[in-house]
Amino acid sequence: MLFWLVLAIAVASLAARFYFGRDAEDRLAAGEAVDFAHLDLPSRDNAYLMCPADPLICNVKADEASPIFPVDPARLRDRWMEMAAAEPRVHLVGTEKDRQHLVYIQHSFFFRFPDIVTVEFLPTGNGRSTLALLSRSRYGKGDFGVNAARVGAWIAKLKALTEAGGNP
């Protein structure tokens, strides 16, 4: 009897989440905005941070150093937006700093759990640029490496796009 009650509650909870939560999950909640200079990441088990060594922008140690791209920040942003638009279940939910700071939400395939991806594009000089990137799960304590895999895949795609296109 208890099994069926727990199962019914779980099914009802998932159904309510799918029915009511879709639009709400595509917005940033209070406290989810990121300032790379003032990061507060209580848990790193469900997040992956990539930051440049120069210019130093992140106030916490990154999981990986950001690459330098052979394009200016505006072109890097344009290529990023092109790459992100081709990704499944990704929504641009915010922009700041003259569109140099972008926030996306990508939903998992089956349960549609939201992950928040924040990126900021930075000049390094001589027509080159880099970025600060944080991918994190909205829910849960661990992510089974999903955020690190996303960052790796997206950076590989971005490198291919920037090396193919370059500056005009």
Residue ranges and their predicted role:
Residues I9-V11:
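Hydrophobic alpha-helical transmembrane segments
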Residues L2-F3, L14-P168:
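Ser/Thr-rich, low-complexity intrinsically disordered terminal regions
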